[in-house]
């Protein structure tokens, strides 16, 4: 149903006005009602597959201007062409590798050589109640711009992100995390030229955590009350000053990926209970640590270019151990106010964890935790060297060796007995 009006000027150049209303249409047939001869082929291809399905409720088409090429009318501002309609149950495709948005409800507007799809309700993968906007500003030089805003639980956000092209590289690492809680709000911005055979989208995802949390039993990690924002692109992740709690201690987190395929570095700092950083060791070896110290943590997450025989995660931790009392006999013992510089490096593999540490100037440690069939890690070896270097050869169980000026054998025997470290299953050798 509509109206049409046609007139000519004194030079017999036609000027027309067309207005039509329509309803109960097929949203996937959108491009059939547009001036296809004036659209570049990549733009036509996207329109043919972009709106994959949908029900058109009501709409209107209007044209007024000279009967000329719409692109010329647009450049000369000598006429206008509109197609405006409501749509529901829409499914909109964006780019290869990305899931289409589904169950969309909103409006579609074509104005001269531009397009605007505004969906005030849309689902993306498992996330519902999102909002999306898709625009092509100029069909003569077409580029697709997309923005999706959505909120969901942390668990849904993580599982959805890992299925996207910008999240797949983190699947191995994230498979070790679970018990997700809290909420996440997300804004996906995608821009893709609609020219050339294989256009690559430029993606920028803004993520805001709202009291999110995650745990890793195998790695001894417990993060809670995570609040703050980060940016995810095809090149990696960036974030500044994310607030969180490591177990119950407040920390601040920065994240940076220097380039595509490179390791992602997570830096954290805070006053942390020292014993918690060693929670994967037998409690008999950590029970005499008491207090919280300022720690700086640097965590490198394996990137796409990391060889498979390298660790998934590499942790470096440093502290002066002020405010942590050590009840282990000399030369480890120290009161809480005293300083003792400690540096530790920990490598996380799928089935094992290796660690090395330097305590003060003359103590070195090395250890290995191995996973059983239930993915529980237990101590396989621990070397404690009172020396500037560790022996190259490793032996199972607890091995103490090196040179020390003074040591109380009675104190150590009593400590080993009280802690259970003297158990034959744990104690391997003592060479002092």
Q: Model segments located where?
A:
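Membrane-proximal interfacial segments on either side of biological membranes
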Residues: 1-118, 122-124, 128-355, 368-432
């Amino acid at each position: 149903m509509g109206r049409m009006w046609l007139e000519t000027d004194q030079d017999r150049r036609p000027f027309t006005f067309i207005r039509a209303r329509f309803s109960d249409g097929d949203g996937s047939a959108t491009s059939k009602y547009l001036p296809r001869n004036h659209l570049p082929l990549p733009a036509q291809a996207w329109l043919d597959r972009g709106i994959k399905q949908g029900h058109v409720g009501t709409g209107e088409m209007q044209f007024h201007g000279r009967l000329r090429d719409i692109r010329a009318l647009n450049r000369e501002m000598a006429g206008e062409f509109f197609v405006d309609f409501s749509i529901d149950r829409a499914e909109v495709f964006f780019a290869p590798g990305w899931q289409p948005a589904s169950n969309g409800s909103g409006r579609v507007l074509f104005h001269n050589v531009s397009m605007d799809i505004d969906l005030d309700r849309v689902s993306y993968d498992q996330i519902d109640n999102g909002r999306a906007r898709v625009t092509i500003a100029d069909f003569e030089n077409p580029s697709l711009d997309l923005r999706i805003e959505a909120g969901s639980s942390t668990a849904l956000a993580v599982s959805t992100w890992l299925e996207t092209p910008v999240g797949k590289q983190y699947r191995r690492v994230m498979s070790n995390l679970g018990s997700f809680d809290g909420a996440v709000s997300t804004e996906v911005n995608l821009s893709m030229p609609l020219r050339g055979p294989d256009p690559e989208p430029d993606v920028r995802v803004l993520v805001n955590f709202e009291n999110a949390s995650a745990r890793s039993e195998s790695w001894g990690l417990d993060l809670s009350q995570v609040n703050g924002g980060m940016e995810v692109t095809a090149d990696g992740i960036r974030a500044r000053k994310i607030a969180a709690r490591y177990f119950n201690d407040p920390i601040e987190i920065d994240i940076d990926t220097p380039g595509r395929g490179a390791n992602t570095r997570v830096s954290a700092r805070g006053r942390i209970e020292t014993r918690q950083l060693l929670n994967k060791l037998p409690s008999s070896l950590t029970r005499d640590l008491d207090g919280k110290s300022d720690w700086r943590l640097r965590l490198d997450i394996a990137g796409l270019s990391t060889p498979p025989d390298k660790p998934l995660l590499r942790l470096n931790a440093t502290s002066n151990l002020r405010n942590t009392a050590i009840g282990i006999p000399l030369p480890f013992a120290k009161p809480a106010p005293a300083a003792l510089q400690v540096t530790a490096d920990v490598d996380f593999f799928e089935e094992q964890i290796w660690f090395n540490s330097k305590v003060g100037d003359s103590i070195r440690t090395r250890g290995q935790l191995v996973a059983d069939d239930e993915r529980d890690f237990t101590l396989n070896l621990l070397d404690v060297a009172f020396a500037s270097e560790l022996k190259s050869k490793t032996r199972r169980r607890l091995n103490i060796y090196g040179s020390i000026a003074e040591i109380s054998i009675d104190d150590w025997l009593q400590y080993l007995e009280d802690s259970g470290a003297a158990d034959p299953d744990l104690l391997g050798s003592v060479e002092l």
